[in-house]
Structure formats: C-alpha cells, structure tokens
Amino acid sequence: MVLSGCVAGQADDQATTTSPTTAEAPSNPWDLPIEQRPALFDPCAEIPVEAVEQGVGGPVEPVDEYTRHQPGGLMVCGWSTDEVDLSVLATWKSRDDYLNDDMFKVQDLSYEVMDRPGLRVGESDDYTKKTCIQIFFTARGTIWTKLDLFGAFHEFKGERFADPCESLDEAMVPIMASFPEGDFR
C-alpha cells in the first residue's frame, strides 16, 4: 500500500510521506507536448543513399520536389530510379489521424516489416494499385515510407507488374537500420 499526504505532529509540524518529485521525462515521447518531443527523424541526413540504392536495386537520384525540411513539423526525402520513386517522411501525425484520414485506405492495422509492426495503407485514389505506404510510430515521430511504381509495366528490379507492397517490403530492408527505435501505436 502506498500512502501519501501530510501528518500533523504534536507541534503542528507537517511532514510529507512522499518522496520529492523529480522531473522525469515520460518514456513515451507521444505523451509530451509537440514542442517538447525529440527532434523528428531526418531521412535525408540519416538514411545513407547506399542503403536506398541497395533497397531499390540501383542508382537513385534525389527528388528535390519531395524534399521538405521543417524541424518539428515535417521532414521528407525522396529518391527516384527509372522504375520507382521512394520517399520517407517524418511527422508527429498520430495513428488515429491516419486511420481517420480519407486520403488513405487501411490495408493492415499491424503489418510487420523486419519484425517491426506498423500500419500498412494505400492512397484512396490509387486505382491502378501502383503505390504502397508503410507507417511506423517511433520515438522520433511517425516514419512514413512510400514506394511508387511508374511506367506502363509497373516494374521493380526488372520484374514487370510487380506488387507495390512486396516491392516496398524489399526496398525497406536496408533502410530500416536507420529508422529510430520504438513502437508507439
């Protein structure tokens, strides 16, 4: 049993029975106000280009149109090959926000990539089934990874009519070592 409070002594002296409070940071950064959370993951600075190239099977070019650097709000980096675009985004958008966002269609509430559970979604308007998105909720924000197959044959590593989610799973293997730890679903 834990007791806390005050007791009165003979001379009306008061003593607390609780230990002094300490300013301990919560173990879940998602419980903190946005301005007190850790720095967002920066995919451009923290994912080696070599890992991206290994994941997509060849040389990549950065996609400047995808790049955003808004510390505390949105960090985005994108790369392109002749077959695919791969983008990684970090934000503090919550799982519930994604589940309630009409722009996304949930495919799996706890899809795992390399034993890390996350949220697998597609874009609601992706009628050609050429994109796939995997979302993790980490200690340094939501990490959103998207693969777009383009071209008439939707190729990935030379395979025609590739499944975008299987392609994303394969592309993520080498880059996931760079992702922050934590699973805060």
Residue ranges and their predicted role:
Residues G9-R185:
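A small/polar (G/S/T-enriched), proline-flanked helix-loop surface module common
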Residues V2-G5:
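C-terminal motif of bacterial Sec signal peptides marking the signal peptidase cleavage site
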